[in-house]
């Protein structure tokens, strides 16, 4: 009788780094990174309008990450939350459902010049788009040393963060 295997039973990933030239390739890389994440996803973007963040499939991948991790953390920071509010109801529903694990911030004034979207999974794997207006990006798996400066960059951007979207609606 076959037994299900956990993602942790998967064979080790060979370290790699690739340059991606299309938004479609980046969208596939985002899905792969979400699938690889075990504890923490750090996401910085201008507004999440590119890369398929509004799709049901992406929301399901994010939900799977949040369910399977023991103490998951999804840290999302954007310059502008309007597109997220209007076009990503599934992600906002995940924020409400997993309020303790999902934080959405808006960048502070000090970080508004940052224009190179990042997605970092567990400090080991990443997608780094060189500039939001260009489709080129670096995609790396099992490269914690290459990821380290990007984690630092994300943390610097995160430190400027202001409350973006709340998981709860308060009011009278």
Language-model segment annotations:
Residues 1-35:
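Domain-start "cap" segments at the beginnings of catalytic or binding domains
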Residues 2-10, 20, 131-172:
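Signature of lipid phosphatidyltransferase scaffolds
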Residues 5, 10, 27, 47-56, ...:
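N- and C-terminal low-complexity/disordered segments
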Residues 17-23, 85-95, 118-132, 150-163:
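Short secondary-structure transition/capping segments
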Residues 24-27, 31, 59, 63, ...:
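Short, well-ordered alpha-helical scaffold segments within catalytic/effector domains
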Residues 33-98:
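Primarily the HKD phosphodiesterase
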Residues 41, 103-147:
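HKD (HxKxxxxD) catalytic microenvironment of the phospholipase D
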Residues 45, 73, 78, 102, ...:
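Long, hydrophobic, amphipathic alpha-helical segments used as structural scaffolds
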